[in-house]
From Swiss-Prot:
<dbReference type="Pfam" id="PF17627">
    <property type="entry name" value="IncE"/>
</dbReference>
<feature type="transmembrane region" description="Helical">
    <location>
        <begin position="66"/>
        <end position="86"/>
    </location>
</feature>
<keyword id="KW-0843">Virulence</keyword>
<keyword id="KW-1043">Host membrane</keyword>
<keyword id="KW-0812">Transmembrane</keyword>
<keyword id="KW-1133">Transmembrane helix</keyword>
<dbReference type="GO" id="GO:0005576">
    <property type="term" value="C:extracellular region"/>
</dbReference>
<keyword id="KW-0964">Secreted</keyword>
<dbReference type="GO" id="GO:0033644">
    <property type="term" value="C:host cell membrane"/>
</dbReference>
<keyword id="KW-0472">Membrane</keyword>
<comment type="function">
    <text>Inclusion membrane protein probably involved in early modification events of the chlamydial inclusion.</text>
</comment>
<dbReference type="GO" id="GO:0140221">
    <property type="term" value="C:pathogen-containing vacuole membrane"/>
</dbReference>
<dbReference type="InterPro" id="IPR035118">
    <property type="entry name" value="IncE"/>
</dbReference>
<protein>
    <recommendedName>
        <fullName>Inclusion membrane protein E</fullName>
    </recommendedName>
</protein>
<feature type="transmembrane region" description="Helical">
    <location>
        <begin position="41"/>
        <end position="61"/>
    </location>
</feature>
Amino acid sequence: MECVKQLCRNHLCLDSLTGPVRSVLTQGTTAEKVQLVVSCLGVVCSIICLALGIAAAAVGVSCSGFAIGLGVIAILLGIVLFAISALDVLEDHGLVGCPFKLPCKSSPANEPTVQFFKGKNGSADKVILVTQ
């Protein structure tokens, strides 16, 4: 259990997620509340259907691999669409960025900068290209 807590603490930004959820529940319109609840239920139901589909395929139900593949793709697409719908509502109430911390951090690109130094008559006397 401690491992799960540590994983959630390290990879979930719950502070940035609970504020928008609370805002939707207290200040959101009925349509936003319904959209958020249905989106969450849709994600959960899609995950359950995905697990049942994989279990049925593992048991050996007489289905073709093509049908199973299409079913898995449809369910995964459902999960993504329901999650996007939920994030859409939360972004209207202050969610900024992804609520998950990515394991690898991207470093900003080191782009060169140009510095202009004016001469006596106002023209560019010296141009220095600075790279970092």
